[in-house]
């Protein structure tokens, strides 16, 4: 048995089973302790975050008026750090070849129904051109773990190909990467290739469940997987994204583990996760979510999002098209700052829509709207869709990004960049009605930029964008 130690780089010490069990017991015991709950809410108002134990008490709290306070605070913190901007991205699936046996994923090695496919570089060009023609500027690369079919060299070559494609006014300006846990040296190579964020979901922090859910393949190794973010940061990757797949294990256990992981990264590297993702298990080929006993309802999902936002105020929060329009709308105000749109979870699914019998998707999409429909929907709700990738390209990553975010100074960069990239989208890709709504929104939102000098520069740049110039940024 290992002691709990957030400073340790041993998985079973920084994600300590006994500490999680004690945290759950503490929260259960104090979920009606109003003086304690009030003190935690007051601490959260300082915008400096909460410990996993404190956040767990808020998650377990079932006093309606206190929950309303938690939701209101989450909304205010989201507004303070991220304003009304919502960053847009799309996943790009390169290959579904996989040697692992994950029981919740249709890519598992024993699945003989799914059509296996790996994109050639020529096919990647077609996929990325289709994504650029939608208006996307930011991608998340996804691939199964297979050292023969999907070696690191294939991923690196694919990144180079993606960055090289410039179709009409299109460009992919940030490539985030979601691939299996690897070595420090390979993370260094990914860094040198110019990736943005390295994303890896823990799936579950419960070691025994993890090993049962990953019975075969290299992913079976709990410690190697859980310590991946440490190796990534040692390899020079400044921005990492963590997450769990809600539904595999008790959500309370996962919530505590997720926050302990964030605390560990902050403790060891001085910077916590750049993003936290909150996917829920979904139907897919060979996978029935009802076979998993720990699914969570929409109310619980919303509470988790709110409590993560309150506990880790600086982190970006992501929900994908796994979630329905209704679910996404609810959590946008509670903490989510980044969503996917117009997504395909099939290999090669952007250039050519896939026939049902050729299914190569990782999961069924719940929000099937086009990117333009989602952009219009966001603006109708009062949000500013952002295609910005400036921080990564200006070197505002890792601790530099976090210091700006925590101080609130990031607002002088983010809103101007959001408005300028939205203007690009409206001119190059938007439907007429979307463009009309967006132009009015930009004129209103410019007034919210804190510094008048920056307002003036943005207005000049918007004129330049009208003339055909692109890629202005602060």
Predicted regions, residues:
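Flexible, acidic/Gly-rich N-terminal and inter-domain linker regions that tether
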Residues: 1-89, 388-389, 393, 416, ...
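Canonical Radical SAM [4Fe-4S] cluster-binding loop centered on the CxxxCxxC motif
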Residues: 82-83, 87-123
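Generic structural signal for well-ordered alpha-helices
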Residues: 90, 128, 156-163, 187, ...
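Core AdoMet radical
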Residues: 109-126, 130-232, 239-248, 270-277, ...
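Conserved C-terminal portion of the radical SAM core fold
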Residues: 143, 197, 202, 223-287, ...
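Active-site pocket-lining/capping segments in soluble small-molecule metabolic enzymes
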Residues: 257-261, 272-275, 279, 335-358, ...
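C-terminal helical cap(s) of enzyme catalytic domains, especially alpha/beta-barrels
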Residues: 351-369, 374
